[in-house]
């Protein structure tokens, strides 16, 4: 089940929500374990886990086979994260990859491989060097997504 680690108020310090987020995710994980379900945390923009470091903190603190990563290249780029650094932090937790690319500060996504997501290099690493056997999803968002806009 793809899921997220809670929207954080726009002007708030995400780190101040660490304990609350961990407590809520532990509740989700208990339910997932009971039903033998894997929760896939996506690094969506604006949530607690939208940076590589906070995603790593979640996986380290919650260490559980029922809680894995859905790695979204574009979301990391749009959060001004280096995808290669994020991959290095998270590769052992990744079970699902979203093929979607972006340019920093750019509201629209761009075709895969044309942004700063380093998609070709990181997929080559995943499959050829690390033996990745998880899922891939082509997620070609090329229009403005403003579903959550006021």
Can you annotate each of these PLM segments?
Residues 1-69, 78-80:
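Active-site acidic/histidine proton-transfer and metal-coordination neighborhood
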Residues 30, 51-71, 76-150:
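Histidine-acidic metal/acid-base catalytic patches
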């Amino acid at each position: 089940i793809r899921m997220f680690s809670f929207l954080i108020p726009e002007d708030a310090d995400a780190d101040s929500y660490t304990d609350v987020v961990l407590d809520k995710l532990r509740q989700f994980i208990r339910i997932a374990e009971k039903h033998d379900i894997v929760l896939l945390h996506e690094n969506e923009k604006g949530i607690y886990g939208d940076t590589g470091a906070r995603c790593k903190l979640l996986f380290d603190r919650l260490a559980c086979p029922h809680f894995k990563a859905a790695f979204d290249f574009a979301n990391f780029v749009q959060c001004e994260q280096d995808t290669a650094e994020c991959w290095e932090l998270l590769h052992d937790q990744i079970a699902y990859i979203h093929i979607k690319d972006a340019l920093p500060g750019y509201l629209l996504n761009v075709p895969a491989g044309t942004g700063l997501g380093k998609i070709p290099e990181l997929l080559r690493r995943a499959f050829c060097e690390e033996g990745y056997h998880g899922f891939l999803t082509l997620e070609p968002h090329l229009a403005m997504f403003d579903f959550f806009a006021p």
